[in-house]
From Swiss-Prot:
Protein name, UniProt field: Large ribosomal subunit protein uL18
MF-aspect GO terms: 5S rRNA binding; structural constituent of ribosome
UniProt keyword annotation of Ribosomal protein present: yes
Record-level GO BP terms: translation
Recorded name of the encoding gene: rplR
GO cellular component: cytosolic large ribosomal subunit
């Protein structure tokens, strides 16, 4: 395992000790791969995913520009916020999953905030 991945796993564990999703305020978790970005809203008490969205979602499939991953992350953030609003989820706890709050991760978070999620 490379040192970047080891460092991210350490940051992830350090963050997860402090961040926990509840039924009233579930956790918005972000996963980033080299091509795609995924977001899911998780209730850690019951261990269930309440909502999910990614660049592979059917709602976004045709509207994404493959060259601009930051714009794709913004669309995923707006989509996850819209899905949460439909399911009466207004407040979440943001889990950046060990990634730096920069680039695609911050773009997703800002778009979700602008679309009405509170965190």
């Amino acid at each position: 395992m490379g040192m970047k991945i080891v460092g991210r796993e350490r940051r992830k564990l350090r963050i997860r000790k402090k961040v926990e999703g509840t039924p009233e305020r579930p956790r918005l978790s972000v996963f980033r791969s080299s091509k795609h970005i995924y977001a899911q809203v998780i209730d850690d008490v019951s261990g269930k995913t309440l909502a999910h969205a990614s660049t592979l979602s059917k709602d976004l499939k045709g509207s994404l520009d493959e060259d601009n991953k930051v714009e794709a992350a913004k669309k995923v953030g707006a989509l996850i916020a819209r899905i949460c609003k439909e399911r009466q989820i207004d407040k979440v706890v943001f889990d950046r999953n060990g990634y730096l709050y920069h680039g695609r991760v911050s773009a997703l978070a800002q778009a979700a905030r602008e679309a009405g999620l509170d965190f």
